């Protein structure tokens, strides 16, 4: 009988397959519950509560239902969504009766009998037959626990279930021991809509005329924070990573009225975010290393570089703003080619102009960042502009015509505002923070998304104050957005059972991370980390008698030139209002394979290193860095190692021989007329080494520009891409990515401008996609 009853029940609970609770009616009893059916094990969980009290305390009881196949040897429910410090209900079939108990655990050990006041009563509607067992029960004293924790029946929360196909040790004993569950999962529930005016009728065995009340009390609480157990607050959108993609998405989604949680694994950066890492000479201002543009080069020489991610083997920023808080801040509005279908963007993305316009209106670029409108330390610009004019280049204000990228040079452009580093932190994040529906948490690391098949239930964090054991759920139609950067997002996907099998198996070999993996039959095979790109870059070092190398930036943190420091502190003007880059240039090259490649150059006083047999004046050195960008064909692979550190598995630099040929041609062209500039000498490489020999000997690690894209690329097929045209991860219902990993091909300039325009467009597409909150 129960088997047919369950089949009749399935149409009513079909909506619950998304693993966010919805209402259904048991066709045998007529009782109306709120719950889910787990599609993997075909177990139904339902709950109904007494009517909400209009005054005074709420009732602490409910009626629950579990319908499970006979193969389910025991079922567990964690009322707070976690095993530890959470009221647990355990039940199994023993012959013609259901055996049940309330349990408690303070660690990942065998739960023991709960010593509180909760009372379980099996109701007469309980049935067992040859295929299924149904347990209908009353749980009194079950929403408030003796340790001070509980669930808030007026708000939203999360429940966890446990399933085992291994029988308990003594089925006749309610306190029997048993082996660890063979599977578990979570689901979100809106308790405020799970109350029924017919609750007393249900206790009397009468369904009455089932109606539910969805009226909320005038005052609600979203979480219970007393005691060691915390009930999680669900969000419409949980965004992982406060880099440029995450911040822009958070601002636009909260602007649309969505309840948004933004999580950042690192801490504050700029003064505005609560940062306090201030140079000794700048203490009166409170402006940090991340505020003052002229301190950029000191990021790489500091003895305590806490801002770099310690579990990623390349430079990656783990702080508010991500890479935009620690990069050189070069900022180029994308050109039409950067969003072309020819480089991999879906046709629906090619009209980037409205989104780039939204970006530039919020965050305009400047090529004269000093507040007095003057440019400083421009000697290298003057020298190289002469060199480039001799090669047929024209000078322009680069961002006035983003499509002009051949034989053009101009002053370096930045996303600084008022003489300080700005980017999305000073703009988009600030408007988001002003909204009551936006929550921002720092120093919270997300290890994985928690999912049941294709449905993401929430995220697992290291912060137990935000949810049971750190789990934070999304609302029934909620979504998760990963914006943790190319390496961070890839690792989260691997640890969530999404990606190439070898990467998930690497997670499986880690005893800590393996416990959070979904069952192998729920792994999603996608090319995460494949096809990664980064600009190969080569440094050429020169001297010229007019150059001021600015002590190679060595003294800017502890002992700057007094006049420059004083000028900056007075009104954010002068040398310290700008970063080290002074000039940028581009040139297009036709490769022998038919692809047009673009070379970009960046000029700055000083040098990261000098390797020369020639005598030289260190106070007169400057660097031209030459990159290859759009059109490059080389790709590599990023992933994780056995310690789960993000790392480069297959280097992507100059794998394609034509890429190398074009880069060498660009290097030769840059120095082709060096003799026409009196006093200009190239010292790295010097006369003892050809450019070919120099490139062949170049350390690949220093060829890395940290402009990683395409690791979770956008596309039309899960065989070749990770996200679809709505930036939704293939094989999932509600997981999205908004960071540089979705960019299918290197843009013509430094990628942060393209990324931020893409984030504007991604946020719009996510909001427009049906089925969301």
UniProtKB/Swiss-Prot annotation:
The gene is CDH-1. One of its GO terms (cellular component) is extracellular region. Pfam families: CDH-cyt, GMC_oxred_C, GMC_oxred_N, NAD_binding_8. One of its GO terms (biological process) is cellulose catabolic process. Keywords: Carbohydrate metabolism, Cellulose degradation, FAD, Flavoprotein, Heme, Iron, Metal-binding, Oxidoreductase, Polysaccharide degradation, Pyrrolidone carboxylic acid, Secreted, Signal. The lineage of its organism: Eukaryota, Fungi, Dikarya, Basidiomycota, Agaricomycotina. It catalyses: D-cellobiose + A = D-cellobiono-1,5-lactone + AH2. Residues 203-227 are annotated as: Disordered. It comes from Phanerodontia chrysosporium (White-rot fungus). Its main location: secreted. Gene3D superfamilies: Cellobiose dehydrogenase, cytochrome domain, Cholesterol Oxidase, domain 2, FAD/NAD(P)-binding domain. This is Cellobiose dehydrogenase.
